[in-house]
Regions:
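Catalytic center-proximal scaffold of phosphoryl-transfer enzymes
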Residues: 1-212
């Protein structure tokens, strides 16, 4: 397994991708999910039905004193992060762009939208929830619950961005797209036994393992 070559791991991002697997003759193929983990801009690993391997690999890296763990709002992402341990070092950050995409789904005026966006961009989650409640913004109950659930993962995005720190999980999303370019070739179907090897080989290539 690749490691960070002596460099401390300061950031990781986790996301899911889809791969089409072969089924018995006469049955339609099925899309199944795999998990992909990107360590900074250096290394990546994707696993199919093997979250334990993903967590073991992350544990083998050289962790910095503080490691930012980025992800979207899906529960599975945070379950894996939590299982990695290192609670005293791991700082979970909700993808700021996904947060704003979810905000955009709430029915409200442009002025209300801007007000809540400003509060959230500054990490003022409690104030944002209060604003939505106080102004009786239509259909905001679900979003308020979403904010409460992820409150500890919503930092001051503006300050992080100004400091040059990541505020989104774009790196792992880019990884998933690069994997898709290989595994979603026109008409491609994979046996479940071969999927792990296909993903590992593709990540090894992207990690530069085959460079001369």
């Amino acid at each position: 397994m690749n490691r960070t070559n002596g460099r401390k791991m300061t950031e990781m991002s986790l996301d899911g991708g889809m791969i089409r697997v072969r089924t018995p003759v006469g049955q339609p193929s099925e899309w199944r999910e795999y998990k992909a983990l990107q360590v900074g801009d250096q290394l990546s690993l994707a696993c199919f039905k093997d979250n334990a391997q993903l967590m073991d690999w992350a544990g083998q890296q050289s962790w910095a004193e503080t490691v930012t763990a980025l992800g979207d709002g899906h529960d599975g992402v945070w379950v894996i992060y939590h299982a990695m341990g290192q609670d005293e070092r791991r700082v979970e950050v909700l993808d700021g762009y996904h947060l704003m995409e979810n905000l955009a789904k709430v029915s409200e005026t442009a002025g209300q939208l801007d007000a809540v966006k400003t509060l959230l961009w500054q990490g003022q989650v409690g104030a944002a929830r209060h604003y939505l409640y106080q102004h009786r913004v239509c259909h905001s109950e679900g979003f308020r619950a979403y904010l409460k659930k992820h409150q500890g993962r919503i930092p001051n995005y503006a300050a992080r961005q100004q400091a040059g720190a990541s505020i989104g999980s774009g790196r792992v999303e880019s990884l998933v797209k690069q994997l898709a370019a290989r595994v979603k070739l026109s008409g491609a179907q994979w046996s479940t036994q071969n999927v792990p090897q296909v993903l590992h080989l593709r990540c090894a290539y992207l990690n530069g393992a085959f460079a001369a």
